[in-house]
Curated annotation (Swiss-Prot):
Organism: Vibrio cholerae serotype O1 (strain ATCC 39315 / El Tor Inaba N16961)
The protein's name: tRNA uridine(34) hydroxylase
Spans through the membrane: none
Job description of the protein: Catalyzes oxygen-dependent 5-hydroxyuridine (ho5U) modification at position 34 in tRNAs.
Domain Rhodanese: 123-217
Gene designation: trhO
Amino acid sequence: MSQYVVCALYKFVELNHYQELRAPLLALMEENHIRGTLLLAQEGINGTVASSRQGIDALLAWLENEPSLKGTVYKESSASEPPFNRTKVKLKKEIVTMGVEGIDPRHVVGTYVKPQDWNALISDPEVLVVDTRNDYEVQLGTFKNALNPKTETFREFPHYVQENLDPQKHKKVAMFCTGGIRCEKSTAYLKEQGFEEVYHLEGGILKYLEEVPQEQSLWEGDCYVFDGRVAVGHGLAESDYQICNACRLPITEEDKQSEQYEQGVSCPRCFGTHSEEQLERFREREKQVQLAKLRGESHIGEESAALIEKRRAEKLARKAAQRGQKG
């Protein structure tokens, strides 16, 4: 079975010319059939993509040849099916959105802890262990005895800290996230708030699951990932989860037994939150997905994406022509 290389990458660096990087980066991704999304902002680059070994190597070489992006941190895993449908490079205000001005992990950040040393740290009764991910991610798995802030977005994390953590009481805080980038900001934020001993898992959960044997692991469950695999376990093996196409949150076999579950339309988490018009649209989409499967096609793939881009280009050309006529 064909294997796809999945590459999660990020780097905090001052990119004053980040807008200029979008076009050449997108061109390289399209030329090498790299799918996924990369975010560019003045504070750096972040994203997860997938391709063949050759495609990912071409991307990494491009990053190394771009002086400001040389040394970009990346982690690789594999997927048996294409985990992404589209190719995107987006310009953003932040590469990971916390919404707090002035947080700069390049200057202030917590202490990195290697996966091999993580168990000893979080087993210390004096260390408060905090999962910085969103609640729906934590539901699939987390470290033993870790606190769940029950946030819906990373923007809510600073409020959780203000309401629940105290630098005078919590002398040692250890935090973790999927690949490490959220902890770059969360540990920087805690340091700015006066917490002295702040630690985070280097390389995130993914690096831990890759390097720490299951028999020695303190991880319980699976790790949610933001692609078609949905979740991975020890050794980064793909887990048996699916995504609800209505709310884009993970669904379990137990969820599928619920009366509130309708394939491609609703799950227990989003049931009752969509209008009838939206539900009908979801049902029609699910119908098209199933028809595409019967034909042995992808509902949204390279050909569909290319057609969308072609139509978009034609639309822009028509608008430009109209403006020219008016001028």
